[in-house]
């Protein structure tokens, strides 16, 4: 999260619009140095030591591409195309193996009804970066701060939240992975589609234990959204799925 505060209060643009710094414009200019329109992150050494895909990962991406209906996914999202017109394996790969720089929200000034010509005295933006294995969250935070300083934005206040989670990855060959695959086939009649998350990384950096986060929600469940939902059928199958995972894992 970054913030810039300039004056003690917002003032009319006619009084100081051409003479004083504009916090929202400073934020906009700073953001433009972070990522290009083709999604390349410009922070120095951001891709240093980036995880390289092996034969196992490439084969799994191809298999996943054959099973995921990207057209249905676009319809669910309400979009006509993915970023950079990606399709097929490239779209699947981007979801799992590409670092991101996402703007969650921006706040500044007045956007209400009527006329008001002010220069806001403060602007805030909240950004999240999704990392891949071998990328250290703390080092990445320092890279962001240094990037802003090097580009003339050292006056921006950068607040890094403590909830940064280290990325991690396990092989599909692990016992727990195989148990989940078998359980999904038994309960749902097909292999699971597992997308990358790193919630467990906070624990696993202290005590390593192969872990997989898997779900059973229905398409359109809108996880984490105000209208998050689950069908009763999926809820019941989820109970059976959890039991099948434990049973299969005990046999591995």
Identify the role of each PLM range.
Residues 44-122, 130-143, 151, 155-252:
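An extended, acidic, His-containing surface patch that forms the Zn2+-binding/catalytic region
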Residues 34, 38, 145-154:
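A common structural junction motif
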Residues 1-4, 12, 16-74:
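Polar, glycine-rich mid-to-C-terminal structural blocks
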Residues 6-8, 16-17, 129-137:
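A generic structural motif
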Residues 1-8, 215-220:
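Short, small-residue-rich loop/turn micro-motifs
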Residues 28-33, 124-125, 242:
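Active-site-proximal alpha-helical segments within enzyme catalytic domains
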């Amino acid at each position: 999260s970054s913030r810039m505060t300039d004056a003690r209060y917002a003032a009319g643009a006619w009084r100081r619009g051409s003479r004083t710094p504009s916090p929202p414009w400073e934020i906009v200019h700073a953001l433009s140095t972070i990522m290009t329109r083709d999604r390349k992150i410009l922070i120095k050494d951001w891709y240093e030591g980036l995880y390289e895909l092996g034969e196992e990962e490439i084969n799994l991406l191809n298999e996943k591409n054959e099973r995921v209906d990207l057209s249905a996914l676009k319809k669910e999202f309400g979009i006509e195309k993915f970023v950079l017109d990606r399709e097929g394996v490239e779209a699947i790969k981007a979801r799992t193996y590409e670092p991101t720089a996402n703007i969650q929200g921006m706040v500044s000034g007045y956007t209400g009804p009527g006329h008001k010509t002010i220069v806001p005295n403060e602007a805030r933006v909240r950004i999240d970066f999704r990392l891949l294995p071998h990328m250290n969250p703390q080092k990445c935070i320092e890279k962001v701060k240094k990037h802003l300083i090097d580009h003339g934005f050292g006056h921006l206040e950068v607040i890094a939240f403590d909830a940064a989670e280290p990325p991690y990855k396990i092989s599909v060959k692990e016992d727990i992975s195989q148990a989940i695959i078998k359980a999904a086939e038994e309960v749902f009649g097909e292999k699971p589609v597992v997308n990358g998350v790193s919630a467990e990384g906070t624990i696993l950096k202290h005590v390593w234990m192969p872990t997989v986060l898997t779900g059973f929600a229905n398409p359109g469940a809108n996880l984490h959204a105000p209208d998050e939902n689950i069908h009763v059928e999926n809820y019941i199958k989820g109970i059976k799925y959890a039991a099948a995972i434990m049973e299969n894992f005990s046999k591995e």
